[in-house]
Design a protein with these regions (language model features):
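DPxDG-like acidic metal-binding loop motif
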Residues: 32, 97-120, 144-149
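ATP-binding N-lobe of GHMP and related small-molecule kinases
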Residues: 1-95, 113-120, 297-316
Length: 316
């Protein structure tokens, strides 16, 4: 198999995982995009990064996008080449907005674009390779498919699956991004090895409710409106409170926003906080005064896109 294109580019959205009860399974694509371009060369690999992570991420073969690109080329049976890569990063790193999943999805999709064959490295394959590298599909799936996703991995076969939901127009995500980082490994280390059966049951019910709400087809008994359903559906007992010591400001912000009537959750492993509903100017002002960067994002209806190359106009 040969490479048909020598200059390609992709864009990939930020994502928020968990969304409260959907630990390691639910995710949402956000309208904030990284863009990556690649020239195939015969020389050594080089990486230029602008924006988020500039000066901190690897700029050679150890770069996460490059590693994903290499793995995908191998999986497809395509030749390896040197690359000149340019990354325009808008997704903050180590903030719970899926920057690593987006980098991996970008790399695998760049391999698809370089190969230039519409039948090679489709979205399901991108999901599988990305989930293998990331370890779980909750951020990878929305980066691949857009919208809201519910994903799973078969522990025996390592097969990965995902279903996509189209959230109702009332879902208007707003991110509250702090000026401090939290590594995913540190956030996971704060979790207990087991949880009470009652807490697991609580989250199963809220996760199912959230799936119904995000599908846009929820009809509640008792006349509950979408806002009331969303407030209940974003409750969690499995991971957020357990991580309070690792990100006290984030959980305090979640408490404050929910007390003010907004369906707020920790985004992924944190420390970003996500409201699934738009917030008023007074909330934005007070949060900004407390040091939070407030970014209305919207839902990205599409996942990763090839923006340059022979496959740029091919739906996949």
């Amino acid at each position: 198999m040969r490479l048909r294109d020598d200059f390609v580019a992709v864009k990939v959205p930020a994502t928020s995982a968990n969304l409260g009860p959907g630990f390691d399974s639910m995710g949402l694509a956000l309208d904030l995009w990284d863009e990556v371009s690649v020239h195939a060369t015969t020389g050594a690999t080089s990486v230029v990064v602008e924006g988020e992570g500039a000066g901190n991420v690897e700029q050679g073969e150890d770069n996460l996008v490059v590693r994903a690109l290499r793995l995908a080329l191998d999986r497809a049976g395509a030749p390896q080449v040197g690359v000149r890569m340019h990354c325009t990063n808008r997704i903050p790193h180590s903030r719970g907005l899926g920057s690593s999943a987006s980098a991996i999805v970008a790399g695998v999709t760049l391999a698809r674009a370089l190969i230039g064959d519409a039948d090679v490295l489709g979205r399901q394959e991108i999901l599988e390779i990305g989930s293998q590298m990331e370890g779980h599909p909750d951020n990878v799936a929305p980066a691949v498919f857009g919208g809201a996703t519910i994903s799973w991995m078969n522990e025996e076969t390592s097969e990965v699956g995902s279903v996509r939901l189209t959230p109702p127009e009332a879902i208007h995500p707003v991110a509250f991004i702090p000026d401090f980082e939290l590594r995913t490994a540190a956030a996971r280390a704060a979790l207990p090895a087991t949880v009470p059966h009652g807490d697991a049951s609580f989250n199963v019910a809220r996760g199912a409710l959230l799936a119904a709400v995000l599908s846009g087809n929820a009809q509640a008994s008792g006349g509950a409106d979408l806002h009331a359903l969303l407030m209940e559906a974003t409750c969690d007992r499995l991971h957020q409170e357990q991580r309070r010591a690792a990100m006290e400001p984030s959980l305090a912000l979640v408490d404050w926003l929910r007390g003010a009537g907004f369906a707020a959750v920790v985004s992924g492993a944190g420390p970003t906080v996500l409201s699934l509903e738009s917030v008023g100017a007074d909330i934005r002002r007070d949060a900004a005064a407390a040091g939070w960067r407030v970014v209305p994002m919207g839902v990205a209806p599409q996942g990763v896109q090839i923006t340059r190359g022979s496959l740029s106009k091919v739906e996949f």
